[in-house]
């Protein structure tokens, strides 16, 4: 089997909503795909003093633990990209929602056994990004 080819290392959608509303929509979309919300934090949390965080860069962490176990059985290196993360950024007046492109993982790890799992996760990420920016 050959390793999946993919177009871009990241998936990006532009949101028509303010960043706070977009983050709320990402959280709702995560629940809609049966993932568990782990935490929400600013990108710089822990690197700056409390109260000084940049709220224009927010990471939403989530996981589907059943899927996680399946993926780790195929290739434990997948753990490097866990938990799943969706990043919401406000820059130059625009709000963007982004994540890694899971189709790249089979290529990065040179493991064709990951193809089906990466394709499934790609669909999940696309669904989250699209649902949160509708």
Can you say where each PLM-predicted feature lies in the sequence?
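Short glycine-/small-residue-rich flexible loop motifs, especially phosphate/cofactor-binding loops
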Residues: 27, 44, 126
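Compact, glycine-rich, soluble single-domain proteins
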Residues: 32-87
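Terminal, regulation- and interaction-focused segments at domain boundaries
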Residues: 2-39, 134
């Amino acid at each position: 089997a050959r390793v999946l080819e993919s177009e871009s290392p990241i998936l990006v959608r532009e949101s028509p909503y303010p960043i706070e509303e977009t983050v709320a929509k990402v959280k709702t979309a995560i629940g809609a795909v049966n993932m568990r919300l782990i935490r929400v934090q600013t990108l710089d949390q822990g690197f700056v003093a409390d109260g000084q965080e940049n709220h224009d860069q927010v990471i939403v962490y989530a996981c589907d633990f059943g899927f996680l176990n399946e993926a780790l059985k195929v290739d434990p290196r997948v753990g490097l990209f866990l938990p799943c993360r969706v990043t919401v950024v406000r820059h130059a007046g625009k709000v963007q929602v982004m994540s890694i492109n899971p189709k790249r993982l089979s290529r990065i790890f040179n493991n064709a056994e990951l193809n089906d799992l990466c394709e499934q996760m790609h669909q999940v990420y696309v669904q989250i990004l699209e649902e949160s920016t509708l």
